[in-house]
Structure formats: structure tokens, C-alpha cells
Amino acid sequence: MKFRSLIKKTSNWLTATPERSLDNAYKAALKIKEIEDNHFGGKKVSKENADYGDSVISYFKTEVNGYLQKINMGLGVFKTSRLFLNISNIQELPQERPTERELQKNATTAAIIFEKLEFIDQVASKYQSRDTQEVYNGSLVLAKESSQDKETQTLDNKSTNQTNSKLSNNNKISSGQNDSRLESASQKTGVLPRSFINTLNKIKQEIDPKSGESEEQVLNKYRKSRLRTALSIKFILLLIIVPLLTHQLTKTFLLTPIIHQYFQNHEQVVFINKDLEEEAFEELSHYEEILRFQGLIGLREPLTDEEVEEKVQEKAREITEEYRAQGIDSIGNVFADLFSVTAFAIVIVSSRKEIEVLKSFLDEILYGLSDPAKAFLIILFTDMFVGFHSPHGWEVILEGVARHFGLPENQEFNFLFIATFPVILDTVLKYWIFRYLNRISPSAVATYKNMNE
């Protein structure tokens, strides 16, 4: 009874998650609206709409930013939980036609949700839409320029100068001109090291006579970089949390009860493959041998054959329940992983702009590393997955995957996989080093060769 009560409470809490998270976001929007009405005449919280000092404006902006973060988190939880509940409700279609009262209740609930979402969008759009759109546009410009650079790069200095002049003209038009010029430099080929060129660019900016414009550009660059980092981290967490949460919810509340009911209706089904059956027989035989051995050496009173058989039967029941539960868990993992992959694909397909932002964020981090750091990461990756000791690691991974899905271990497949996949991976890595890294950072390749030798 306690377990059923706990399951019911958990189910009710999960069902109420969308409404609860939307209410939190709505309350945060009300707080922002209250600050606007009481101190800024119902307008946006900014210095232009009030006669306060810098300290007061900074205080109100800090409050508004805190409420905006609550709104973003609440809406994120609202969308994610609604997606999970919709997936779960597909399996629970009503058998009878809903009554007029139920339809009216659903319509009222939907109207309230729409009203709250509209109010939240009306309040939050004053503070988020412009900056977010600038980050999206800047990331798209970076992606386009990066692809153009990769297509037009040559070792000839004349071609390099033409590419640089073309990029500088495009940067005058785009809003993120300095960001694009500095970040795309990591993807160009030049005679001088990239770090030396970046240092010269920084000195050039610092001695620029248009100091006021440069300061404004630095502030805009910092704001865009901060927002891009926040969006990238949020998207990475979403890519991790959504599949994991989908796996746990579908497995716990949808798949496990169905599979458990099937095993109850088919009591003759105990093992889902021969390997588990052999493990169970070995465990039972080992238990019987322990009982007889302990009786022979005096660790316990000698047991008669009837007593030994009784204890072995009890152990056999325990083993049956244990391996039946293991089979239920393995079958549930197969279908739960399919749901997780589907959820992951939905997030990827519906987040094109976020992917562009994440790509520019990762490029900035990876290509901004020092040459020894790049060489260290390459050596660590190669030694771990394609090195001398990698076959042992791949064996452990393959055994874990087989046990996760309840599949029997196949030594021939394991040997074939270990003999081919690391070789393919090593070939792809060497091609990447030769094709891209050798042009982007030749010193990193030289450092990698020296460290590898």
C-alpha cells in the first residue's frame, strides 16, 4: 500500500509539473510588471524611462534579470514536462467520449494557459528578444563566414589577403563585426602564428583613436558572449536532461508495468537468453556446494539431503525472481532507449538556431586552446580509444551494452568490432589532423608529433 501511495503521489506531482512551472514563470512576470508600473511608468526598466541614479537602475536591472531567469527556467520545465506528458498520454486514450463538463473544463484550462503565456511573452519580450536575436544572427554569420573560409583558404598570400578584405567588408555590414573578424581568424591559414596575429589585433584596438566606439563594441561583445555562453550551456543541459528524463519516465510509468504484467501471465518465462540461464545454474550449484562444504568442515551443523534440497529450492525461487526482474529491466531498456533517441531527435530538429549558437561556442573554446592543450587532448583520446590498451576497454563497453539490452554475449562480434572500429576511428582522426588541424594550427600538429614520439 505504501508503495502504491508513493507511486500515486509521484504521478500526481509529475502531472502537476507543467501547471506549477508555468505559475512560477507567471509570478515572476507579475513581479517585473509591478516594478515597471511602480517605478518606470509601465515602461521597460531602463535609464531612459526614469530619473534614477546609476545605482538604483543597476539594482532594478538585477532584480529584473533574476525574474527573467525564473521565467526562462519555468518555461523550459513547462515545455519539457508537457512533451513527456503528451508522449505518456498517447498510450492512455480515453475509451469513452468526454462529457460536456469535461470539455468545458479543458477549454477553460487551455484559455488560462494561453492568457498566462501571452502575458509572460509580453513582459519578457522587452528584455530578451533583441539580445537573443543578435546572438542568433551573430552565430549564423560566424557559421557562414567559417564555411566560406574553409572553401576559399589557400597557401597563397594573395588569396589570403583577398579573403581578409572580403571578410572585413562583410563585417562592416553585420552587427557583430569585431566578433566575426576575431573568431574567424582561428579558421584561417597564415604564415604567422594565430596567437601573434590576435595579439596585434588587440593592440590595434587599444590604440584606436575612436575610443568611445571601441568601448561600446567591447561591451556589446561581452554581452553577446555572455548570452551565447548561457544559451549554449542551457542547450547542452537540455540535450542531456531530456533523453535521461524521457528514459526514466517511460521506463518507470509506461514500460515496466506492461512488461511485468506479461511476465506474470507467462510464469514459464524466466530467462531471456542462454547466458543468464547458465549464470543462474552456476549460482544455484555454487550455493549447494557451499552448504555441503560448510557442513563437512564444521562451520555449521551437517544438513540432511532433505534440508539441503529445501534450502536449494528456496534459493532457486530467489534466483528466479532476481533474473526475471533483470529480464524485465533489460527489455524496458530497449524501448526506453528508443523513446530517449526520439526525444533527442525532436530537440535537435526543433533547435536549429541553438545548434548554431552551440557550434560557435564550442569552436571558440576548442580552437582557443593552447597548442600543448590540443596535443594533450588528441593523445589522450587516441590512447584511450585506438591505442594499445583500447581493446580491453572496448570489451568492457561491449559487455556492458549487451547486458544493458539483455543480449547474449557474442565473442565473434566483439572480436570483429574491436578489429575494425578502432582502425576506422584512427583513420578519421588522422584525416582530421591532416585536413583541418594542420591548416588551422600547424604548431599544435608539431607539438602533437613531438609528444607522441
Curated annotation (Swiss-Prot):
Compositional bias segments (type: Polar residues): 154-163, 176-189
Ranges of compositional bias, category Low complexity: 164-175
A Pfam family the protein falls into: CemA
Keywords: Cell inner membrane, Cell membrane, Hydrogen ion transport, Ion transport, Membrane, Transmembrane, Transmembrane helix, Transport
Main subcellular localisation: membrane
Keyword field contains NADP: no
Gene Ontology CC annotations of this record: plasma membrane
Single GO molecular function: proton transmembrane transporter activity
UniProt-listed InterPro entries: CemA
Record-linked HAMAP family: CemA_PxcA
Family, similarity comment: Belongs to the CemA family.
Function of the molecule: Required for H(+) efflux immediately after light irradiation to form a rapid H(+) concentration gradient across the thylakoid membranes. Together with PxcL, contributes to transient H(+) uptake following dark to light transition.
Protein name per Swiss-Prot or TrEMBL: Proton extrusion protein PxcA
Organism: Crocosphaera subtropica (strain ATCC 51142 / BH68)
Organism placement in taxonomy: Bacteria, Bacillati, Cyanobacteriota, Cyanophyceae, Oscillatoriophycideae
Gene: pxcA
